[in-house]
Amino acid sequence: MEGEIIAVNGPVIDIYFPDDVPNVYEALELENPVKNEKLVLETRILLGDHRVRAIALGSTDGISRGLKVKRTFHPISVPVSEEVLGRVVNVFGEPIDGGDKIKGEMTPIIKNAVEFRRVEPSYSILETGIKAIDLLTPFPQGGKIGLFGGAGVGKTVLIMELIHNVAVAHGGISVFAGIGERSREGNELWLEMKESGVLSKAVLVFGQMNEPPGVRMRVPLTALTIAEYFRDYLGKDVLLLMDNIFRYVQAGMEVSSMLGRIPSAVGYQPTLITELGEVEERILSTDTGSITAVQAVYVPADDLTDPAPATIFSHLDSTLVLSRSIAEMGIYPAVDPLASSSQILEPKFVGYEHAEVARKVVEILQHYESLKDIISILGVEELSEEDRVIVNRARKIQLFLSQPLFVAAAYTNIPGVYVPREKTIEGFKAIIEGEVDDLPEDAFYMVGTLEDVKKKAQEHGALMY
């Protein structure tokens, strides 16, 4: 079944089919006569009179009116099998790492979420080894987690650290979707995973900044399809990482504009909620396995009320907000403990001790926040004795939330540390109960456990008891 191109407007192509027209989301193929390569289109609008409008998932250089277009009778499909592990692929599941072609069952990337009766809510905790996360925003296995932050506050570094820790500590499978981010960062991630030996348990799916919007909009679905294969057919618990889900929204905005839709609030596409739902509702735990999704979310102008971050918020189980002011203090990961939250930070899920320590930590930090204006005007000396103790402990908590990361070791010259959840709780419990009040503040900066704090204080000549 062939059609003929009747109009080309950048990545938007109109095609006339004399017989049956393709379905919406059906993939179409044509040969680019200039580049001698295949170009895939995706049907988006049925215009009537045997005409359809499609979006090109590749460069349209050399495409002209009159070229023949073939129907495939199915949506974009990718090969899924265990062969995809350790590989870097594009939106079509084709290798871009110079390796052999991947063999596997061709699976459509556009499909419905699993049946409701197969969904199993999971309340077990995914330990990350990162203190700020494990204490204040524990990740539910099989849940959806968002890393919110503006440009340059450390979202990508934190995602790379999570890949490292989950692969090394849990031996789990990771699927990484690079959506509209820098090619350089993708290359760094690939090299980092190669060097740390975790690449064999991971799949990287890239649709970077230089790709057409149609590609950037479909990369998360390709990554999801691969993750679903490992969950449904191999019974695995999969960590799905998306960097950056906001670029998916941006790509949808570009496609929507090209298709002539009237924009919604702040210029976003009118289908924003539907498009995000198509991705988020497929991230589920089932009776066979789970997909835990960690999504980096760029926050335009650090405004969390922007329609894109606000819509993403509604889908999440844990929200991790990265703060520019905390990053400027040199505390990494720059997690804002007062803005971040987790639905499973309750005694019935994490245990009474964990929930109580986390509550007291937040309480102390909130009290410190309320005292900051007084301190800046009058100084710490004018505070009551009780408030001075609170300030002392709050500063130690702030510094103890920092941690040397494995993926940043090359830049900081400080070896990375994985901190078990029990050690994290033990350390913060000691601070809030006043057991380490006489130790200097700088001993709490960029260390792992309480033992490391005492060792650092001893090295600095502090009194130990």
From Swiss-Prot:
The keyword Chloroplast does not apply. Coiled coil: none annotated. SUPFAM superfamilies: C-terminal domain of alpha and beta subunits of F1 ATP synthase (SSF47917), N-terminal domain of alpha and beta subunits of F1 ATP synthase (SSF50615), P-loop containing nucleoside triphosphate hydrolases (SSF52540). It is found in: Cell inner membrane. Pfam families: ATP-synt_ab, ATP-synt_ab_N, ATP-synt_VA_C. It is an enzyme of class 7 (translocase). GO terms for cellular component: plasma membrane; proton-transporting ATP synthase complex. F-type ATPases have 2 components, CF(1) - the catalytic core - and CF(0) - the membrane proton channel. CF(1) has five subunits: alpha(3), beta(3), gamma(1), delta(1), epsilon(1). CF(0) has three main subunits: a(1), b(2) and c(9-12). The alpha and beta chains form an alternating ring which encloses part of the gamma chain. CF(1) is attached to CF(0) by a central stalk formed by the gamma and epsilon chains, while a peripheral stalk is formed by the delta and b chains. Produces ATP from ADP in the presence of a proton gradient across the membrane. The catalytic sites are hosted primarily by the beta subunits. This is ATP synthase subunit beta. It comes from Dictyoglomus turgidum (strain DSM 6724 / Z-1310).
